[in-house]
């Protein structure tokens, strides 16, 4: 009995202490996260009511209709009312859950309503790090992000190695970043503060350290931050390539200029492999290689010249897209934005085509998997 009490006390304490944790998803600081919070709470309450009704009916049937020696064998009869209820009620439940879910999912793709024009930030994952390039401000950060409050931010998500998932729980849900693609994801912070961001898609041994901080500040403070960032060291191609290596420690860094001056990761997905060669980095399995030997051959200085702008993504030529190259002295003007919009539309077409193709393959596979003499 004492053992049972100890276990009960332990689990009870864990449950109570869990209430003291900061559940970021329920601590929304932006319009997208707020709509997700409503949907989650709505779904939980709805399903709790269903569970409560089912368990109550289950208990009633057990105690009221339990078998005893005086029980008579029941006879089944057709009952239109009961049959209607068990068909109609589940349909109503599915509709009640589907309508707000579908509406919210489609609303995610629309920029939050704001008087301010959206700010564009290129968010690139590589080497278990996050790189944030500000094309208009001409600055770039690593593992840290600063955004103005009450202004929508259009994140253009790209991956240079493994597929990752960009997630800031207090601002909105996650969206995948994939090699050879640029995916748009618009978020907004309604309050000032510091929030946590991370990669939510397991992608290797460095997954746990692929995190970043998000600083939401007033516009005046953001302008001051940009001014200070422009006084930092200019991001060179050598420095950028070195930061792409998983062997380079994860640090919060700020640079003047951006990597957009010399590479568009979506247009040149093979770029990172050349960066590996420049520093003699060879990928090794940490399960079979001692930790001290993983990066022993990596050099401090590049052994090859910097890579020139190239297009190794066949979709770019196929869809008439240009690499998004923006020099540090070039204006982020309407002409460049026009090319951005064109690329975004073509990327959406590519994504939709891939989804349709996968759905078609899945459908044909399901047909072939049916039983019979095949």
From Swiss-Prot:
Q: Name one GO cellular component term.
A: plasma membrane
Residue intervals passing through the bilayer: 43-63, 82-102
Q: Which UniProt keywords apply?
A: Cell membrane, Electron transport, Lipoprotein, Membrane, Oxidoreductase, Palmitate, Respiratory chain, Signal, Transmembrane, Transmembrane helix, Transport
The top EC class, named as a word, is: oxidoreductase
What single Pfam family name could you report for this chain, choosing any that match? COX2
Q: What is its EC number?
A: 1.10.3.-
Please report which positions carry a covalently bound lipid of kind S-diacylglycerol cysteine.
20
Kindly state which reaction or reactions the protein catalyses. Answer: 2 a quinol + O2 = 2 a quinone + 2 H2O
Q: How is this protein situated with respect to the membrane?
A: Multi-pass membrane protein
Q: What's a BP term from Gene Ontology annotated to this protein?
A: ATP synthesis coupled electron transport
- Residue numbers spanned by region Disordered: 321-374
Signal peptide residues on this chain, from the entry's feature table:
1-19
One Gene Ontology molecular-function label: copper ion binding
- List localization entries: Cell membrane
**What is the top-level taxon of the source organism?**
Bacteria
| Stated family | Belongs to the cytochrome c oxidase subunit 2 family.
* Name this protein carries in UniProt: Probable quinol oxidase subunit 2
Organism expressing this protein natively? Staphylococcus haemolyticus (strain JCSC1435)
């Amino acid at each position: 009995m004492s053992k049972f009490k100890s276990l009960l006390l332990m689990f009870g304490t864990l449950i109570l202490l869990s209430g003291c944790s900061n559940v970021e998803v329920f601590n929304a600081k932006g319009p997208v996260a707020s709509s997700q919070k409503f949907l989650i709470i709505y779904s939980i309450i709805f399903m709790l009511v269903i569970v409560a009704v089912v368990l109550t009916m289950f208990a009633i049937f057990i105690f009221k209709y339990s078998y005893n020696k005086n029980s008579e064998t029941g006879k089944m009869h057709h009952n239109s009312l009961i049959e209607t209820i068990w068909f109609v009620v589940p349909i109503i439940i599915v509709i009640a859950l589907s309508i707000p879910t579908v509406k919210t999912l489609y609303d995610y793709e629309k920029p939050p309503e704001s008087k301010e024009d959206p700010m564009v930030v290129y968010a690139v994952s590589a080497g278990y790090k996050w790189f944030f390039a500000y094309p208009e401000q001409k600055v770039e950060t690593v593992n840290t992000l600063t955004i103005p409050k009450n202004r929508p931010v259009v994140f253009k998500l790209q991956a240079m190695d493994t597929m990752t998932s960009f997630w800031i729980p207090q601002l909105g849900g996650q969206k995948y970043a994939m090699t050879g693609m640029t995916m748009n994801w618009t978020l907004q912070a309604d309050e000032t503060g510091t929030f946590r961001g991370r990669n939510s898609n397991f992608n290797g041994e460095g997954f746990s350290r692929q995190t970043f901080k998000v600083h939401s500040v007033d516009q005046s403070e953001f302008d001051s931050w940009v001014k200070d960032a422009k006084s930092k060291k200019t991001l060179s191609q050598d420095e950028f390539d070195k930061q792409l290596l998983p062997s380079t420690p994860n640090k919060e860094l700020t640079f003047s200029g951006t990597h957009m001056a010399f590479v568009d990761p979506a247009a040149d997905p093979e770029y990172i492999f050349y960066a590996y060669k420049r520093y003699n980095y060879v990928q090794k399995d940490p399960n079979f290689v001692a930790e001290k030997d993983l990066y022993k051959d990596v050099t401090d200085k590049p052994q090859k010249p910097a890579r020139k702008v190239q297009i190794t993504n066949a979709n770019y030529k196929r869809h008439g897209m240009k690499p998004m190259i923006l020099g540090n002295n070039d204006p982020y003007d309407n002409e460049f934005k026009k090319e951005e919009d064109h690329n975004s539309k073509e990327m959406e077409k590519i994504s939709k085509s891939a989804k349709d193709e996968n759905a078609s393959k899945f459908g044909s596979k399901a047909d072939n998997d049916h039983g019979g003499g095949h």
